[in-house]
Amino acid sequence: MEEDKRWIVVPTWRVPGRMEKWHSLVKYLKYKTKDLEKVCYVPHHKVGWAWWTCSRVIFPLKGNSHLEIQAYWNLTPEKGWLSSYSVRITWYTEKFWTDVTPDCADVLIHSTYFPCFTAGEVRRAIRGEKLLSCCNYPRAHRAQVPSLQFLALVVVQQNDRPQRDSTTRKQRRRDYRRGLRLAKQDSRSHKQRSSESPTPRTYFPGVAEVLEILA
């Protein structure tokens, strides 16, 4: 007797294009800038038996928890949609796990990765001094109710330091473009040189923007 086919239904977010942009940016931030050095990137040929999985990116978080972004491909092959992609975003803790939205994923990632304003920046802004830190993950704050202190720091960062801010934005654009070009180069080996000067912190545009997720 032939066994009926069993289906496992999970919530996913559809991605309109291919996954090279996401993979290249993760590898660039992991191996080059070291912003995501602790992140585990698992390509499709190392996933194992899960042939429908394109990649797995695991973000270790604080408090013995982690966030996993798992990309799927070869969706609905019976309809010929072999070029369709989607991602599943899951948050794991010691006692439970749950699927989360891209906005929630941004908040979780920013809690561990990419620097933000330090506690002393408010006092520096009140005294009219230059800010010594900035937020490199502004997308993570869109899902939250911002405090007056945070809004004030954003305004100071944008208006009070035009020359430095312009340089920072140019550096962010260069870092982002370099990360995206890694997909075309298909570079799988990354050399780590201790004699090189540390690379400046990289701006991260957000999970939904990089993946171009269709809500």
Swiss-Prot record:
Coarse class of the protein's main subcellular location: host cell
Role summary: Counteracts the innate antiviral activity of APOBEC3G. Forms a complex with host APOBEC3G thus preventing the entry of this lethally hypermutating enzyme into progeny virions. Functions as an adapter molecule, recruiting APOBEC3G to the ubiquitin-proteasome machinery. Targets APOBEC3G for degradation through the assembly with elongin BC complex, CUL5 and RBX1. Binds viral RNA and affects the stability of viral nucleoprotein core. May play a role in viral morphology.
Region span, Multimerization: 154-167
Pfam families hit by this protein: Vif
Subcellular location: Host cytoplasm; Host cell membrane; Virion
Feature: compositional bias, Basic residues: 169-181
Bilayer disposition of the protein: Peripheral membrane protein
Misc note: Required for replication in 'nonpermissive' cells, including primary T-cells, macrophages and certain T-cell lines, but is dispensable for replication in 'permissive' cell lines, such as 293T cells. In nonpermissive cells, Vif-defective viruses can produce virions, but they fail to complete reverse transcription and cannot successfully infect new cells. Vif-defective viruses show catastrophic failure in reverse transcription due to APOBEC-induced mutations that initiate a DNA base repair pathway and compromise the structural integrity of the ssDNA. In the absence of Vif, the virion is morphologically abnormal.
Chain span(s) of sequence motif HCCH motif: 110-141
Comment, domains: The BC-like-box motif mediates the interaction with elongin BC complex. The HCCH motif (H-x(5)-C-x(18)-C-x(5)-H) mediates the interaction with CUL5.
Single Gene Ontology BP annotation: viral life cycle
InterPro entries on file: Vif
Self-association and partners: Homomultimer; in vitro and presumably in vivo. Interacts with viral Pr55Gag precursor and human APOBEC3G. The interaction between Vif and APOBEC3G is species-specific, which may play a role in restricting the replication of HIV to humans. Forms an E3 ligase complex by interacting with human CUL5 and elongin BC complex (ELOB and ELOC).
PTM note: Processed in virion by the viral protease. Highly phosphorylated on serine and threonine residues.
One GO CC annotation: host cell plasma membrane
Phosphothreonine: modified positions: T98
Family: Belongs to the primate lentivirus group Vif protein family.
UniProt KW keywords: AIDS, Host cell membrane, Host cytoplasm, Host membrane, Host-virus interaction, Membrane, Phosphoprotein, Ubl conjugation, Ubl conjugation pathway, Virion
Motif (BC-box-like motif): 147-156
Superkingdom of the source species: Viruses
Disordered: annotated span: 161-203
Conditions for induction: Expressed late during infection in a Rev-dependent manner.
Name recorded for this polypeptide: Virion infectivity factor
